Amino acid sequence: MNRSHHQHRYAHRLRTSAAAGISLLEVVVSIAVLSLLLSLVAPAILSMRDRSQALECRNRLRQLGVAAQERLATTGKFPKTSIPGQFDTTAGNASVAYISTSPFRELIASLDSNTADMIFQNEGDWGRDLAATLGHPFPPHDLGKQKIPVLICPSETQPQARLSYRANLGSAPSVHRSGMSQQDRLHSVGAFSNGFAITPAQFKDGMSNTVLFSERISGDFDANRYSPFRDSFRGQGNMMQVDAAMEICKTQAVVTPDHPDSEAGKDWLLGGWLSSWYNHVAGPNSTVPDCASLHDFGGGDALLSARSLHAGFVNAGFADGSVKSVADEIAIDVWRAMGTREAIDSQSE
């Protein structure tokens, strides 16, 4: 009797266990449902991350604007993009009139006091080293390669990047005004000017209408590959006029262009088109690749556009300290007007 009873209970457990088990079909269905949910949720998570990074990118650009306003309150001028050259004829060295530097050199005291101390302790040696290299500025101790978080947009994916923001040198390709058309001369007057510190009175269009800094992603840091959106190259021909610069950079951007440079953003202390300057010749995130006439030097003519990894826009900091997102689809005449401190009617172009 007891044995029969135990056998009955055992058989009941087996039937219950079989009924409670999961079939192969149920496993497949469950995996399919989970995959579907993941495919729906993952883009939302990525989108949230992208928005968060873009917001922090704006915040860091705003900090740069605050630092520029502090500099303005202290000196009455915005930072320079170059310092006087050093003249040393005793050793037969050639001299340079200006040494291209980043405006962040003068803002760093408000952003990172420790790095600022290092810069100004070595100022004398730095100037002599710069002059000796004839416009190839490489500060000692790799100061410009010090990683300062506020200078790097969180969206940047290259670990070597040290600078995600650049100074607006105007809406014309050249930093020199001789030989330009009248319209291009007006466009060349950016928030920053090579060799001069700009005062508020020089913003004829108003500081709230002129971009001070904008984003520019780094190069791909791969010397064996040319990435048109990230990298730049040396353009062949006269690039002083806007239309000519657009045509040269567009047509000469072949698979292996002349002197491609993949190290944009490697240093926040250097000046020049390859390091910390940009212009409004082409629109934000332009499909026209960047190029410059004097690719190894700070000055010369260039098309160097604002570029970001955000979907459809770049962040721009204005001279009054405000920060705005500017869509890729902005009319080019409006974008160029935002790049100059001259009072230009964007509808007249």
Which role fits each region the language model picked out?
Residues 3, 9, 15, 32, ...:
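Intrinsically disordered, low-complexity segments enriched in polar/charged residues with Gly/Pro
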Residues 44-349:
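Internal low-complexity, small-residue/proline-rich segments
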